Amino acid sequence: MVTQGPRFMACMHEMKREVLDHYDCITVGEAPCATVEQAQEITDSNTGALNMVFQFEHMDMDSQPGKGKWALKPLHLPDLKASLSRWQTGLHGTGWNSLYWCNHDQPRAVSRFGDTGIHRVRSAKMLATCLHMMQGTPFIYQGEELGMTNVAWQHIEAYQDIETRNMYAQAVNHKGLSHQEVMTSIHAKGRDNARTPMQWSAAHQAGFTTGSPWLALNNNFAQVNAQQALADPDSIFHYYRQLISLRQS
């Protein structure tokens, strides 16, 4: 959705009346600048225009304010908890939350909010528990249920994302930052982290294709893949199934 202006809700109500109301569908708006109050208005069950919105407040908490997503700072857990609580209480009884940790434009959840070492499985389950135990509709991005992680390629040529390539050129060629400084930010926030081929098995090309994928595989596909997860009753995948079943019951 575009940033809110004086006629925003009037336009949204017109779209709802003329288009959306003619279909049996769920509507979700991407609202990166929305406040809790604006989301209440948009998703109000009686007077709103959409069923739910994607808000981005918790997506900016590991970036330096006003400096863009590439300017990294450590995530402060109390701030994250306060943000999630604010959106939970703010929309309770009026609007509706979209719950998510990652998507095609964000890094992998377990790399960003959890641990990719010995606690990868536990931290992935912790994030899944948090997501599914809040009020709202959980959105699970492909590979999240396996605990797929960020990549850490050392050469910019390995990346396909135009945002990443442009940022690298600007930072190194015009701002004088070192290759390693920029790659540290890319490893943490690059969009290609979430765009590597789905890891189906430990077979050639992770079982994704018999050809050559557009983007290289994550090197850990032999250990992190769907075939392995389905065979392990204590896997992240089966834990997600338990959480979904719990919500449905």
Show the residue positions of the predicted features:
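Active-site and adjacent substrate-binding regions of carbohydrate-active enzymes
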Residues: 1-249
